[in-house]
Amino acid sequence: MKTVLAFLFLTFIAFTHAESYEDVKEEIKNEVEREIFEDLEEESDVLESNVRELNDAKPWRFRRAIRRVRWRKVAPYIPFVVRTVGKK
């Protein structure tokens, strides 16, 4: 909400002090670009912190390995493995 109010305030200032429509358009464009770059910087900081968390050593590695198994590809072989193990 603060960003919207700041944007509207800057737009109002631009309209009251601008010499022409082109000046207003250019000033608004610059403000929008600046806000977008600031948001992207914030998001990249969040993503970098998430990457650090993902690279940390985690417990339950075996559990995560089981989750990654493609069960649809493995499921047809389960009865064969059970029969083979049961024969011994």
Curated annotation (Swiss-Prot):
The keyword Transferase does not apply. Expressed in entodermal epithelium along the body column. The modification Valine amide is found at V85. Keywords: Amidation, Antibiotic, Antimicrobial, Immunity, Innate immunity, Membrane, Secreted, Signal, Target cell membrane, Target membrane. Residues 1-18 form the signal peptide. Residues 19-57 form a propeptide. It is found in: Secreted; Target cell membrane. GO terms for cellular component: extracellular region. Antimicrobial peptide with a broad-spectrum antimicrobial activity. Keeps its antibacterial activity under a wide range of salt concentrations that mimic physiological conditions of human blood, which is surprising, since Hydra is an obligate freshwater animal with nearly no salt tolerance. Does not affect red blood cells. Belongs to the arminin family. This is Arminin 1b. It comes from Hydra vulgaris (Hydra). The lineage of its organism: Eukaryota, Metazoa, Cnidaria, Hydrozoa, Hydroidolina.
